[in-house]
Amino acid sequence: MGGDLPPSHQTEVFENLINDKLNQFCPEKTVRISSQDKPWVTAEIKYLDRLKNREYTKKGKSLKYKQLAKQFKEKYEMEAKKYLRKNMDELMDCKPGQAYSVLKKMGAQPGDCIDSNTFTLPGHESENLSDQESAERIADYFAQISQEFPPLDRKLLPLRVQQKLDSQSSLPPIIDSHDAYQKIKAAKKPKSGVPGDLPRVIVQEFAPELAAPVYSIINNITQSGEWPTQWKQEWVTPIGKVPIPETEDDLRPISLTPFFSKVTEHFVVMWLLEYIGELIDFRQYGGIKGNSITHYLIEFLNFILINQDSTDQTAILACMVDFKKAFNRQNHNLLITKLSDMGVPSWLLKVVMAFLSDRKMVIRYKGKLSSMKNLPGGGPQGTLLGLLLFIVLINDAGFE
């Protein structure tokens, strides 16, 4: 599918075709979900409840009503058990620091499932800002941080990197339909996607059929060094870094990106790690498979105990440093230079450059959307590739 079309055009054809067929064979039905619902209540349960109540209003406790009531009860109990069983498994397998959040989720009461950005910042309240104006203010704040840096530009890169980009030291790999199918099945499907994303159940059921056009698009991306424009739009939900946010500084932007962009990121991360995996500082515990904050704490305690046993050590001073908005303050030109110096080939550098260039963001706040904002710097939080690129940027920060 797509032939010699650019990735953006090929992606547009693919998404339009899929959405047209989806609307034709699976038309949308509106189901209202309340913040007072239990966390295991699904759209199907709400739909059955509505049918049951409608039948009761028309004909009382008819045979059809009893059948619908039975279906509703069975579905409700099944989803409740599934929800609790899943969270029990998660509790048994989770890291120690995550246990509280899992337990809190298991004991969710009506009203606990309210959207995470229902807070109102005191400054916005005192200025009498509408939800739309607040969304715009938050978007301007986050965009302003990223705009501290110049956009990614080949002319701003060192000469050695420019020469590398003009050369072709190796050819990009070619993936097949089976490779794409495995990544589609493995990729995490968020409960709330971005506009245009396919429903999770459709992706799950039709993964084999979707794999063919997806692998064609990914091969087109690696061959052309272009990233689809549609996949560079971030739908950002601000969440509080503290229980009660006071200012925009207390907010963390969590990005949602198109599902098939995430699938492509899985491949890019895999290819990057083939070149730089062994060069990542062994003291980097966050975002690295097999490492966790628990490993860091053990290493830190070990460092303290070893130095306490030393005869020439009388005191140990530990200084904890936190860089403000570090994820939003990434210089893309510096990042590409570091990747090049770590041995990443030109074709893969071009793919990463395409991923980072011309990104845009829109804030979702209390059901309102801000206008699109340009992001010449920073990295999308909540994305697989964005996390690895941040690790690369700070890789040489540690020293003995």
Question: Model-derived features: where do they sit?
Answer:
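Short, intrinsically disordered, charge-balanced linker/junction segments flanking boundaries
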Residues: 1, 388, 397-400
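Short amphipathic alpha-helical heptad-repeat segments
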Residues: 41-49
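Short, solvent-exposed helix-loop connector elements
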Residues: 1-9, 28-37, 56-60, 87-88, ...
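Basic/polar low-complexity segments
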Residues: 14-33, 59-176
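Conserved pre-catalytic core of RNA-dependent polymerases
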Residues: 142, 170-380, 388
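Short, charged, low-complexity patches
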Residues: 7, 11, 15, 131, ...
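Amphipathic alpha-helical blocks
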Residues: 2-32, 90-94, 142, 151-153, ...
